[in-house]
Structure formats: C-alpha cells, structure tokens
C-alpha cells in the first residue's frame, strides 16, 4: 500500500529534539514577523503617524 505506513516510529529523545528545533524555528519566525513593522518604521524617512478618526 503506502510505504510510509510501515515505517518505525522515532524514539522519544529524537522526537523531543526535533520538537524543540521546530518550536524554536516557529518562535523565531513569530519574533521576526512581529518586529518587522517596528524596524521598517524606524528606518523609514517619513515620520507621519497613521491617525484614524471615527
């Protein structure tokens, strides 16, 4: 059938190591995406603020 169905499961230590790596990568991407607007606004020349009037 499908060859992936019969593969061995990785041991717990290897799975935890991979999970830590993936969580660290995800966290770093979140930090980069959250910090990007602040960094871009710091380096932009225009000092205009966005004002929304209701």
Swiss-Prot record:
One GO CC term on file: mitochondrion
Top-level lineage group: Eukaryota
Bilayer topology annotation: Single-pass membrane protein
Main location, first listed in the record: mitochondrion
Keywords, alphabetical: Acetylation, Membrane, Mitochondrion, Mitochondrion outer membrane, Protein transport, Transmembrane, Transmembrane helix, Transport
One GO process term, biological-process aspect: protein transport
Expressing tissues: Expressed in roots, flowers, young cotyledons and leaves.
Compartmental location: Mitochondrion outer membrane
InterPro entries: TOM6_plants
Residues carrying N-acetylmethionine: 1
Quaternary organization: Forms part of the receptor complex that consists of at least 6 different proteins (TOM5, TOM6, TOM7, TOM20, TOM22/TOM9 and TOM40).
Function: A component of the complex responsible for the recognition and translocation of cytosolically synthesized mitochondrial preproteins.
Protein name (record): Mitochondrial import receptor subunit TOM6 homolog
Source organism of the structure: Arabidopsis thaliana (Mouse-ear cress)
Gene name linked to the record: TOM6
